[in-house]
């Protein structure tokens, strides 16, 4: 019986599209090119898609013979001696899908990729370029005048911008789900109810697998979570026709990975953001929720920590923490018909029974378990009601829904006016967020795949004992989720998520035995590395939804941002305003067409003729009303029954049906992650190795001066980091010039002036405006007359740079040591020392090294055998003869020694 499980690696990783006049032949192979599959695509159908998959696994020789026959069979009589009948159209790395507008189908292929992360040996790639190929032949093509316009709209979705995929790791699910799924078949076989389960369904591809016995490994592949899959509509037409290895699901969002080097021990910190494909769109055009409970700008962010010393999922140490952002789950919008920086918020529909919020939170209970914690960052005190409208409605909805949930699983609501606290000089925003983060992580816990370390049991930490979640024999599970929102879910939300992630990261490091206390300080290499990841994450998500990068960053809320940052904030605000006003409508049309929300149909209005897309996203407006859920029992009974555990991770018939389990031998390529990661069949170089090229705390953040503590958890001064000191040329000179310029520069603009149209400020709320304008810049000003002090800052003493200080005159002992050092160096390089005689007083006792061996200059092509003396040769020959039974006669000394041994032992 198999005792282990592993994810199945797709056998279609390299593709070549061959073309004839009647068909396309798509040949796919694994990376080692030992197994091949072939798809046949008919080109004679003008509007229908005909794809044939024979599901046969070819060898390389069989594929060559097949292509050779196709080449000969498609040659015409005129070209028997000349051109080929089979043309190689394009090489690719995966199929994004098939799409049709008003003419025939197109095939979308990934032609360039770049590795972005590595999780347990499973590579995550970013799409760099794609190719869109029209399938029908020109002889059967039926042209339509609007086809080219639809094609331009579809291609406006830039697939080379933050789309990710993996051949072996399910990016649509969390690490906790993926590792839980690997245990499901093994636990099912061990359970007493396995027989009853087998009678009701069969998840195993091999018949009689359970009764066969023997050793092996379960290969497991699960269904993706379609909410975070962006090409599901493009693959839907072939999903039931072709082998599942052809289906490559992609996600949209962000993926970044950095290496935390802890005294030489590599620890990978990975950040993955999954953007929902439901109710997706741009900032002002997608607000609130639709009728199915899907909210705008919904992003699931997961931080993964793994010890890179061990690659395997079963033997390695892995930890993750998940949190979510999303628009307030109500029917609300903002009118953008008038040119206003902050359009008024309006409630489109009354929802007294919180029906749409109930659907949304029921989905979250099923995926994440309980408790659901809402961190609401919108304003609560305004002279003119703007953001406060959302707070009041959200409080009412949560209060209503909590009446019908069990008390231990109620929704936790945390309101906090972050913009108000930012304006106050007496309140530290991040300190308050840190308190909230501690309480949140203690309630939800986090995932780790190993039990508590022995030192944690002997010397338990007080905070560790209060940690929530679900404890299992093999580790911990995260139960529940933090849902953070403001108005746009961009700037404030990203800072709040960073603080919660920083708190969770401390617990993750503590669980892996890397720190002695679950606490991380600012201005350490580890936190700087993590902050940079989160800022890249926030910039990417902000560009996707708002059209610009973040306006307010972590440094802004720490109030340590340089004065030059304010001008950048103004530019980002203007960029966001321009994008929202002029380009959001076109981007929304592209998203609707790409995701299949709108299907072009002959005789019906075109996409650009629709006055609004409201009816596309709210399907109940164009059909009969479906049966509504109960207003009191708004949750799914099966979901609540298994709380606080997420229902999607519970071993039950519904979840096991989503798995495909197949038995493999231990070293088969479909489950051999070692072979997939190291690829011993190809030549590689260190320059191209991903793990050496990724961002590292030691190379990019740790100071390069001598005597610095190499620990990434040591608090450093702002000017000691590797980024600020060695990241740019002449940084210290630039810092001096910046301080001189700042002395004569005007004070930084207030936060109201910086982002009048950003999400963090309201044009009518100016209660604490004075506190902002009085904020002083954190950069220390240097007067123009202090040139001597500026020079001292540039030229540091040797003691501070190298950790040693040389006096004006050396002692006699030091002088002798230095003379010996020079003598050794000269002897090493065999220099002429005729004119470099040292005085006898200094050269006494100098070590003279004389080589006693001379080695030949061997190379990879030729090695000269060393010379062996006669005695050694005789000993070796006697050893060989002894193994053949030919013993040498004993000498007198050996005989005397043996007699002495017998006398002492037996007599």
UniProtKB/Swiss-Prot annotation:
Residues covered by the SAC domain: 154-547
What tissues is it present in? Wide-spread.
Q: Catalyzes what?
A: a 1,2-diacyl-sn-glycero-3-phospho-(1D-myo-inositol-3,5-bisphosphate) + H2O = a 1,2-diacyl-sn-glycero-3-phospho-(1D-myo-inositol-3-phosphate) + phosphate; a 1,2-diacyl-sn-glycero-3-phospho-(1D-myo-inositol-4,5-bisphosphate) + H2O = a 1,2-diacyl-sn-glycero-3-phospho-(1D-myo-inositol 4-phosphate) + phosphate; a 1,2-diacyl-sn-glycero-3-phospho-(1D-myo-inositol-3,4,5-trisphosphate) + H2O = a 1,2-diacyl-sn-glycero-3-phospho-(1D-myo-inositol-3,4-bisphosphate) + phosphate; O-phospho-L-seryl-[protein] + H2O = L-seryl-[protein] + phosphate
* Keywords associated with the record: Endosome, Hydrolase, Membrane, Neurodegeneration, Neuropathy
Compositional bias ranges of the Acidic residues kind: 758-770
Identify the InterPro entries for this entry.
Fig4-like, SAC_dom
Assigned EC number: 3.1.3.-, 3.1.3.36, 3.1.3.86, 3.1.3.16
GO cellular component terms?
Answer: endosome membrane; lipid droplet; recycling endosome
Q: Where is this region: Disordered?
A: 707-790
GO biological process: any one? locomotory behavior
Question: What are the subcellular locations of this protein?
Answer: Endosome membrane
Pfam families named among the record's database cross-references: Syja_N (PF02383)
Cysteine disulfide links:
none
Q: What class of enzyme is it?
A: hydrolase
GO molecular function annotation: phosphatidylinositol-3,4,5-trisphosphate 5-phosphatase activity; phosphatidylinositol-3,5-bisphosphate 5-phosphatase activity; phosphatidylinositol-3-phosphate phosphatase activity; phosphatidylinositol-4,5-bisphosphate 5-phosphatase activity; phosphatidylinositol-4-phosphate phosphatase activity; protein serine/threonine phosphatase activity
Matching entries from PROSITE patterns are given as: SAC
Q: Does the keyword Hydrolase apply?
A: yes
The UniProt function text for this chain reads:
The PI(3,5)P2 regulatory complex regulates both the synthesis and turnover of phosphatidylinositol 3,5-bisphosphate (PtdIns(3,5)P2). In vitro, hydrolyzes all three D5-phosphorylated polyphosphoinositide substrates in the order PtdIns(4,5)P2 > PtdIns(3,5)P2 > PtdIns(3,4,5)P3. Plays a role in the biogenesis of endosome carrier vesicles (ECV) / multivesicular bodies (MVB) transport intermediates from early endosomes.
Quaternary structure, per UniProt, is: Component of the PI(3,5)P2 regulatory complex/PAS complex, at least composed of PIKFYVE, FIG4 and VAC14. VAC14 nucleates the assembly of the complex and serves as a scaffold by pentamerizing into a star-shaped structure, which can bind a single copy each of PIKFYVE and FIG4 and coordinates their activities.
Q: Which PANTHER family match?
A: POLYPHOSPHOINOSITIDE PHOSPHATASE (PTHR45738:SF5)
Disease / disorder: Defects in Fig4 are the cause of the pale tremor phenotype which is a multi-organ disorder with neuronal degeneration in the central nervous system, peripheral neuronopathy and diluted pigmentation. At postnatal day three (P3), affected homozygotes have diluted pigmentation and reduced size. Intentional tremor develops during the second week after birth, and abnormal limb postures are evident by the third week. There is impaired motor coordination, muscle weakness and 'swimming' gait. There is progressive loss of mobility, reduction in body weight and juvenile lethality.
Protein name per UniProt = Polyphosphoinositide phosphatase
The species this protein belongs to is: Mus musculus (Mouse)
């Amino acid at each position: 019986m198999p005792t282990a499980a592993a994810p199945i690696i797709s056998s279609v990783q390299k593709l070549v599209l061959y073309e004839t006049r009647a068909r396309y032949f798509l040949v796919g192979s694994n990376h080692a090119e030992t197994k091949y599959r072939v798809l046949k695509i008919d080109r004679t159908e003008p509007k229908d898609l005909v794809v044939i998959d024979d599901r046969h696994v070819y060898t390389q020789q069989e594929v060559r013979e097949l292509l050779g026959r196709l080449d000969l069979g498609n040659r015409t009589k005129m070209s028997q001696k000349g051109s080929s009948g089979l043309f190689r159209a394009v090489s690719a790395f995966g199929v994004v899908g098939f799409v049709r507008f008003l003419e025939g189908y197109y095939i979308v292929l990934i032609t360039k990729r770049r590795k972005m992360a590595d999780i347990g040996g499973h590579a995550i790639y970013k799409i760099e370029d794609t190719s869109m190929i029209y399938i029908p032949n020109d002889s059967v093509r039926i042209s339509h005048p609007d086809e080219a316009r639809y094609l331009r709209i579809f291609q406006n979705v830039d697939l080379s911008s933050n789309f990710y995929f993996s051949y072996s790791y399910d990016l649509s699910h969390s690490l906790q789900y993926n590792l839980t799924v690997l245990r499901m078949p093994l636990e099912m076989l061990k359970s007493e109810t396995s027989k009853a389960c087998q009678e009701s369904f069969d998840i195993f591809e091999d018949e009689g697998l359970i009764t066969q016995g023997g050793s092996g490994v379960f290969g497991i592949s699960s269904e993706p979570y379609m909410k975070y899959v962006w090409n599901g509509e493009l693959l839907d037409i072939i999903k039931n026709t072709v082998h599942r290895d052809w289906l490559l699901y992609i996600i949209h969002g962000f993926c970044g990975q950095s290496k935390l080097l802890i005294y030489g021990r590599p620890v990978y910190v990975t950040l993955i953001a999954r953007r929902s494909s439901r109710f997706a769109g741009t900032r002002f055009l997608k607000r609130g929720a639709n009728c199915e409970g899907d909210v705008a700008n919904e992003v699931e962010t997961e931080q993964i920590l793994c010890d890179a010393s061990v690659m395997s999922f079963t033997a390695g140490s892995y930890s993750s923490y998940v949190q979510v952002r999303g628009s307030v789950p109500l029917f609300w919008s903002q009118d953008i018909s008038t040119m206003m920086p902050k359009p008024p918020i309006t409630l489109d529909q009354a929802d007294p029974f919180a029906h749409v919020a109930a659907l949304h939170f029921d989905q979250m209970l099923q995926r994440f378990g309980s408790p659901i914690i809402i961190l609401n960052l919108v304003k609560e005190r305004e002279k003119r009601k703007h953001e406060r409208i959302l707070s009041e409605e959200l409080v009412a909805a949560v209060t209503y829904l909590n009446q019908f949930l069990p008390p231990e699983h109620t929704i936790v609501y945390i309101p906090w006016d972050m913009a108000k606290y930012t304006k106050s000089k007496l309140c530290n925003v991040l300190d308050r967020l840190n308190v909230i983060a501690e309480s949140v992580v203690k309630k939800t816990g986090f995932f780790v795949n190993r039990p508590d370390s022995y030192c944690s049991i002997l010397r338990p930490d007080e905070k560790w004992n209060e940690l929530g979640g679900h404890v299992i024999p093999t580790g911990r599970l995260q139960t529940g989720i933090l849902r953070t929102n403001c108005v746009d879910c961009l700037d404030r939300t990203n800072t709040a998520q960073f603080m919660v992630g920083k708190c969770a990261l401390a617990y993750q490091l503590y669980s892996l035995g890397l720190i002695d206390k679950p606490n991380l300080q600012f201005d350490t290499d580890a936190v700087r590395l993590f902050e940079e990841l989160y800022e890249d994450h926030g910039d990417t998500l902000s560009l996707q939804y708002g059209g610009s990068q973040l306006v307010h960053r972590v440094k802004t809320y720490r109030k340590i941002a340089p004065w030059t940052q304010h001008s950048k904030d103004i530019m980002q605000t203007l960029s966001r305003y321009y994008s929202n006003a002029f380009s959001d409508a076109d981007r929304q049309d592209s998203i609707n067409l790409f995701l299949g929300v709108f299907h072009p149909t002959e005789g019906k209005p075109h996409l650009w003729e629709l006055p609004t897309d409201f009816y596309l996203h709210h399907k109940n407006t164009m059909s009969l009303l479906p049966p509504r859920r109960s207003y009191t029992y708004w949750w799914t009974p099966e979901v609540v029954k298994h709380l606080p555990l997420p229902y999607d991770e519970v071993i039950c018939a519904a979840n096991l049906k989503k798995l495909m389990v197949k038995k493999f031998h231990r070293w088969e390529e479909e489950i051999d992650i070692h072979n997939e990661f190291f690829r011993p069949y190809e030549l590689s170089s260190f320059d191209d190795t991903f793990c050496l090229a990724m961002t590292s705390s030691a190379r990019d953040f740790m100071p390069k001066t001598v005597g610095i503590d190499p620990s990434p958890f040591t608090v450093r001064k702002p000017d000691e980091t590797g980024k600020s000191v060695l990241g740019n040329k002449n940084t210290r000179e630039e810092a001096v010039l910046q301080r001189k310029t700042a002395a004569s520069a005007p004070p930084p603009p207030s936060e109201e002036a910086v982002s009048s149209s950003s999400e963090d400020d309201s044009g009518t709320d100016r209660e604490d405006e004075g506190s902002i304008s009085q904020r002083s810049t954190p950069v220390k000003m240097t007067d123009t007359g202090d040139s001597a002090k500026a020079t001292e800052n540039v030229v540091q003493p040797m003691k501070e740079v190298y950790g040693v200080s040389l006096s004006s005159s050396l002692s006699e002992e030091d002088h002798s040591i230095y003379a010996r050092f020079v003598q050794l160096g000269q002897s090493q390089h065999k220099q002429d020392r005729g004119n470099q005689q040292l005085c006898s007083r200094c050269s006494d006792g100098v070590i003279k090294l004389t080589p006693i061996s001379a080695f030949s200059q061997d190379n990879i092509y030729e090695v000269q055998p060393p010379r062996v003396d006669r005695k050694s040769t005789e000993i070796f020959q006697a050893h060989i003869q002894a193994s053949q039974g030919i013993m040498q006669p004993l000498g007198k000394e050996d005989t005397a020694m043996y007699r002495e041994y017998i006398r002492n032992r037996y007599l």
